[in-house]
Amino acid sequence: PIKSSAASDVYKRQIIYRKYLLPAKCQHPKKVGRYIKMKLTILGTGNAKVTKCYNTCFALNEDKEYFMIDGGGGNTILKQLEDAGISWKEISTIFVTHKHIDHLLGIIWMLRMYCQGMARGQFGGEVTIYGHDEVISLLKQMAEMLLTPKETKFIGDKVHLEEVKDGEDRTILGHRVTFFDILSTKAKQFGFSMEYAEGKKLTCCGDEPYNECEQKYAQNSTWLLHEAFCLFSQADKFKPYEKHHSTVKDACELAQKLEAENLILYHTEDKNISRRKELYTEEGRQYYKGNLWIPDDLETYKL
């Protein structure tokens, strides 16, 4: 995903750590020895109003089974999956962090694909969608209002809309996943932490600034996913704090404090998108000494 010929000095360190990166189309890694097979595909990297990239969402997978987190704001989720080489039929589990439209509405399209595929005899699998009570209630209401009776009859049968509570565990992709309330003041929102290998965990803090209640999940994460609305140097322009968001500086200081091995920044503005990787890395390196990743849409990381 990163072309060394275009890399500037300020983010060449990312090239050094390119062992973590795989092309988005690489779906069949070699099963060698005790290598960790888990991969992370970033389907979208932008905030709610971006037009030059897709809204923030991503997928985790081992082999051909996928766990998708959020769906962005529309049917572009179908294009992102297609461009990433992921079939919607391979996504067996979804988690929706909260009800904001840039995270939720893509899930309605996924529901349509599953239910319509079942109604037409084109999909024989099952899918589980997790979320807190507000998300699950809203998805049920929207499905009843927007989908046909032939489609909605599969909800509760082969399409499971399952509520999770703060601190609850589920087994997803064969691994323990713990969901937690980030105590948002805007809209109820959950994050999660996955123990994907012995001594390895990935933690998603949602799309708002870290709250101290998340420490027991986020501390010492192998991979930490955190929002960064904009550069700290451009905070006056983008006003992240008024929107209850972080800057690159804030997120990197946090990751340093939490001793995260790798930090992925997402949910960004798109006005700097042509130089985002360079500019965000340059600012972040001043505050975080671990492996800093500023993904573009469709980049894939081997965990």
Task: Enumerate the predicted regions with their spans.
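Short, Lys/Arg-enriched N-terminal segments with co-localized hydrophobic residues
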Residues: 18-19, 23-37
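Active-site neighborhood of phospho(di)ester-bond hydrolases with catalytic His/Asp-centered motifs
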Residues: 68-72, 91-102, 106, 132, ...
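Active-site metal-binding motif and surrounding structural segment of the metallo-beta-lactamase
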Residues: 75-127
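Conserved beta-strand hairpin/beta-sheet module of binuclear metal-dependent hydrolase folds
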Residues: 38-84, 188-206
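Cap/insert and terminal regions of metallo-dependent hydrolase folds
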Residues: 209-298
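Single conserved hydrophobic/aromatic residue that forms the stacking wall/gate
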Residues: 1-14
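Active-site-proximal loop/helix segment associated with metal-binding centers of metalloenzymes
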Residues: 50-52, 163-233
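Metallo-beta-lactamase
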Residues: 123-188, 197, 297
